[in-house]
Amino acid sequence: MCIRDRYMFETHIEQGPILEDAGNDIGVVDCVLGMFNYRLKFYGQTTHAGTFPMPKRRDAFFAASQALCYLHEEIDKLGYSDLVYTTGEVVCHPCVHTCVPDFFDFSFDSRHEDPKVLEKVLAIVKSCEEKTWAGCTCKVEKAWNRDTVYWDKKLVSYVKASAEECGIKHQYIHSGAGHDAQFAAYMLPTTMIFVQSKDGLSHCEPEYSSPEHCTEGATVMLNAVLKADND
């Protein structure tokens, strides 16, 4: 990361496979995608796992699994190849192997550049409240959301020019992950530079970016900072 006078540059690993798949070493980042996170909560009835007949059950875990499959099917029908969505956190109660769950809660995170696309996704998410799932009710609650943050166009051009002058293969790319720079962008001109992540892996032990790729990122940032300093 580099802050000089009125600019901010942040170099970061891509955390995805796009650069590696394209055979490019540097990502000229133009924005951080808009995103939202909601919680879907399902309410059923706890009963004994061995004594309560299947047709009479109100299994909140099973209800949530039906809803999650519904979300995947309906959102995929929208046809946006660059849209991503994830369920990464779940809560189950009473979470005992001898009990049918009476409560299940899962997170739903979705990200895209266009707010109109996210509105379509959100409409599908909210529709879960209107349905009964395996005899259970569903409540949809907003956790947080953020709008797409675009980087300063002049700084982005400096990053691209720097990569070109250094003879480093590069491409424009969006950031699907949130970064410190997106908050700085509300206060001063900001941009980012991505370097390759091996196999696109991040937030896990195999996460790796080679010293060579990191050096390229630092070189591109240095030259971009010098361009901004001479502006």
Predicted regions and their residues:
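Zn-dependent metallopeptidase/amidohydrolase metal-coordination segment
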Residues: 169-220, 225
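Glycine-rich beta-alpha junction loops
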Residues: 13-17, 36, 46, 112
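Short beta-strand segments
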Residues: 8-14, 41-43, 194-196
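Conserved small/polar residues in nucleotide/adenosyl-binding loops
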Residues: 1-5
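Alpha-helical metal-binding/catalytic segments enriched in His/Glu/Asp
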Residues: 36-42, 51-75, 108, 184, ...
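Short beta-strand/turn micro-motifs at beta-sheet edges
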Residues: 26-30, 93-98
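Acidic-enriched catalytic cores of C-N bond-cleaving enzymes acting on peptides and small amides
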Residues: 6-9, 18-23, 30-31, 54-89, ...
